[in-house]
Protein backbone atom coordinates (compact mmCIF):
# COMPACT_ATOMS: atom_id res chain seq x y z
CA UNK A 1 0.00 0.00 0.00
CA UNK A 2 1.26 3.45 -0.92
CA UNK A 3 0.35 6.40 1.28
CA UNK A 4 1.53 9.94 0.75
CA UNK A 5 1.19 13.05 2.84
CA UNK A 6 1.94 16.31 1.10
CA UNK A 7 2.20 19.18 3.55
CA UNK A 8 3.27 22.80 3.32
CA UNK A 9 5.95 23.64 5.86
CA UNK A 10 8.27 21.59 8.04
CA UNK A 11 7.71 20.17 11.52
CA UNK A 12 9.57 21.50 14.54
CA UNK A 13 11.54 19.00 16.59
CA UNK A 14 8.73 18.51 19.12
CA UNK A 15 6.04 17.81 16.51
CA UNK A 16 8.43 15.64 14.51
CA UNK A 17 8.93 13.44 17.59
CA UNK A 18 5.16 12.93 17.91
CA UNK A 19 4.80 12.34 14.16
CA UNK A 20 7.53 9.69 14.23
CA UNK A 21 5.83 7.80 17.08
CA UNK A 22 2.78 7.22 14.89
CA UNK A 23 4.81 6.78 11.71
CA UNK A 24 6.58 3.85 13.37
CA UNK A 25 3.21 2.30 14.30
CA UNK A 26 1.87 2.81 10.77
CA UNK A 27 5.01 1.20 9.30
CA UNK A 28 3.66 -2.25 10.25
CA UNK A 29 0.90 -1.70 7.66
CA UNK A 30 2.24 0.79 5.14
CA UNK A 31 5.04 3.19 4.36
CA UNK A 32 4.12 6.84 4.36
CA UNK A 33 5.92 9.01 1.87
CA UNK A 34 6.04 12.47 3.47
CA UNK A 35 6.53 15.28 0.98
CA UNK A 36 7.14 18.66 2.57
CA UNK A 37 6.61 21.75 0.44
CA UNK A 38 8.52 24.83 1.50
CA UNK A 39 6.13 27.59 2.53
CA UNK A 40 6.12 30.36 -0.08
CA UNK A 41 7.19 33.78 1.18
CA UNK A 42 4.84 36.12 -0.61
CA UNK A 43 3.03 39.16 0.81
CA UNK A 44 0.17 38.82 -1.70
CA UNK A 45 -1.99 36.06 -0.13
CA UNK A 46 -3.80 35.19 -3.37
CA UNK A 47 -0.49 34.76 -5.20
CA UNK A 48 0.95 32.76 -2.28
CA UNK A 49 -2.01 30.35 -2.42
CA UNK A 50 -1.61 29.93 -6.20
CA UNK A 51 2.12 29.22 -5.90
CA UNK A 52 1.73 26.74 -3.05
CA UNK A 53 -1.13 24.98 -4.84
CA UNK A 54 1.03 24.64 -7.97
CA UNK A 55 3.88 23.15 -5.91
CA UNK A 56 1.47 20.67 -4.29
CA UNK A 57 -0.07 19.62 -7.61
CA UNK A 58 3.41 18.96 -9.05
CA UNK A 59 4.18 16.52 -6.21
CA UNK A 60 1.03 14.38 -6.39
CA UNK A 61 2.06 10.86 -7.47
CA UNK A 62 0.59 9.57 -10.71
CA UNK A 63 -2.73 7.69 -10.39
CA UNK A 64 -3.04 8.62 -6.72
CA UNK A 65 -6.44 9.19 -5.15
CA UNK A 66 -6.14 12.60 -3.50
CA UNK A 67 -7.82 13.87 -0.34
CA UNK A 68 -7.44 17.49 0.64
CA UNK A 69 -7.85 18.16 4.35
CA UNK A 70 -10.29 21.07 4.46
CA UNK A 71 -12.74 22.77 6.80
CA UNK A 72 -15.27 22.49 3.94
CA UNK A 73 -14.67 18.75 3.50
CA UNK A 74 -16.79 15.74 4.36
CA UNK A 75 -16.94 14.79 8.02
CA UNK A 76 -16.64 11.12 8.72
CA UNK A 77 -16.35 8.71 11.60
CA UNK A 78 -13.11 6.86 12.23
CA UNK A 79 -14.56 3.65 10.76
CA UNK A 80 -15.42 5.41 7.51
CA UNK A 81 -11.96 6.96 7.35
CA UNK A 82 -10.51 3.48 7.98
CA UNK A 83 -12.36 2.16 4.93
CA UNK A 84 -10.46 4.66 2.75
CA UNK A 85 -7.24 2.98 3.81
CA UNK A 86 -8.29 -0.21 2.02
CA UNK A 87 -7.43 1.49 -1.28
CA UNK A 88 -3.91 1.75 -2.65
CA UNK A 89 -1.99 4.86 -3.67
CA UNK A 90 -3.64 7.50 -1.49
CA UNK A 91 -2.43 11.06 -1.03
CA UNK A 92 -3.50 13.33 1.81
CA UNK A 93 -2.83 17.03 1.40
CA UNK A 94 -2.40 19.60 4.15
CA UNK A 95 -2.24 23.06 2.62
CA UNK A 96 -0.45 26.09 3.96
CA UNK A 97 -1.79 28.46 6.57
CA UNK A 98 -3.81 30.30 3.92
CA UNK A 99 -5.12 27.14 2.29
CA UNK A 100 -5.03 26.11 -1.36
CA UNK A 101 -7.06 26.65 -4.49
CA UNK A 102 -9.70 24.07 -3.57
CA UNK A 103 -11.10 23.88 -7.11
CA UNK A 104 -8.32 21.39 -7.92
CA UNK A 105 -9.42 18.90 -5.26
CA UNK A 106 -12.60 16.85 -5.61
CA UNK A 107 -12.20 14.80 -2.43
CA UNK A 108 -12.12 16.84 0.75
CA UNK A 109 -12.10 15.58 4.33
CA UNK A 110 -12.84 17.59 7.46
CA UNK A 111 -11.75 16.19 10.83
CA UNK A 112 -13.39 18.96 12.87
CA UNK A 113 -15.03 22.37 12.80
CA UNK A 114 -12.11 23.50 14.93
CA UNK A 115 -9.03 25.06 13.40
CA UNK A 116 -5.73 23.38 14.32
CA UNK A 117 -2.14 24.53 13.91
CA UNK A 118 -0.78 22.88 10.76
CA UNK A 119 2.00 21.09 12.59
CA UNK A 120 -0.43 19.62 15.11
CA UNK A 121 -2.81 18.64 12.33
CA UNK A 122 -0.11 16.57 10.66
CA UNK A 123 0.22 14.60 13.90
CA UNK A 124 -3.58 14.26 14.10
CA UNK A 125 -3.69 12.97 10.51
CA UNK A 126 -1.05 10.30 11.04
CA UNK A 127 -2.73 9.26 14.30
CA UNK A 128 -6.01 8.82 12.42
CA UNK A 129 -4.19 6.82 9.75
CA UNK A 130 -2.84 4.52 12.45
CA UNK A 131 -6.31 4.34 14.05
CA UNK A 132 -7.74 3.38 10.66
CA UNK A 133 -5.24 0.56 10.23
CA UNK A 134 -5.95 -0.58 13.80
CA UNK A 135 -9.69 -0.70 13.02
CA UNK A 136 -9.11 -2.58 9.75
CA UNK A 137 -6.83 -5.11 11.46
CA UNK A 138 -8.87 -5.60 14.66
CA UNK A 139 -6.14 -4.17 16.88
CA UNK A 140 -7.38 -2.93 20.24
CA UNK A 141 -6.74 0.78 19.94
CA UNK A 142 -9.99 2.37 18.78
CA UNK A 143 -12.73 2.45 21.39
From Swiss-Prot:
Gene3D superfamilies xref list: 3.40.1280.10
Single annotated GO MF: rRNA (pseudouridine-N3-)-methyltransferase activity
CDD domains: RlmH-like
Enzyme class, first EC level, given as a word: transferase
Residues binding S-adenosyl-L-methionine, per UniProt: 95, 111-116
One cellular-component annotation, GO: cytoplasm
Membership in a protein family: Belongs to the RNA methyltransferase RlmH family.
Subunit structure: Homodimer.
Protein name per its UniProtKB record: Ribosomal RNA large subunit methyltransferase H
Species of provenance: Metamycoplasma arthritidis (strain 158L3-1) (Mycoplasma arthritidis)
Organism taxonomic ancestry: Bacteria, Bacillati, Mycoplasmatota, Mycoplasmoidales, Metamycoplasmataceae
Amino acid sequence: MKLNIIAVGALTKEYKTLYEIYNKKVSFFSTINLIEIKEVTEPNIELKIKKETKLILEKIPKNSKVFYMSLTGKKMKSEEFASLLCEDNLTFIIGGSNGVEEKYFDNKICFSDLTFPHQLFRVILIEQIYRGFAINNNIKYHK
